[in-house]
Amino acid sequence: NDTYPAACKLALIDALGPLAESTKKLAKAFHDLADKHINDVTIGRTQLQDAVPMTYGQEFHAFATLLKSDLAAFDRVVPLLAQLNLGATAIGTGICADLRFRQSATKHLAQITGLPVTAAPDPVAAMTDMGAYVSTSAAVKNLAVHLKKAADDLRLLNSGPRCGFNDLNV
């Protein structure tokens, strides 16, 4: 009851690393496109209806901003995931475990992983709390929604050339 959740949390932190790196690269690419197209005017649309003028730079900047907010969410969940109930045993009381194990194990894990691993301040609460998993799921889902939005917008703007918008050539 303490080992599997600790392993799962560490695995999630490990999985977030490459995802965050890829997201940073994409955010930078959108920022670069925003700078390149800061003065290229297009029409903004709402519900596929023409609305008001905007620049492609503004659109690409918006994509980058959303990705940066997702990266900030990743940064917020890592410390939650790094709080481990390792050594809390069956229900969080630590019964039958050496009193030094929790601190020793988390200190060792922090050293060998380079992660900000700490012992959960209340192991009984940590045993039942799913908040770190829920927050991580929400952060990843939000990233997925933002990526889908960008992909859908780019696909639509690239539609054509004869009967679609044909605003962009990706």
Positions of PLM-derived features:
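Conserved, well-structured ligand/cofactor-binding cores
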Residues: 1-170
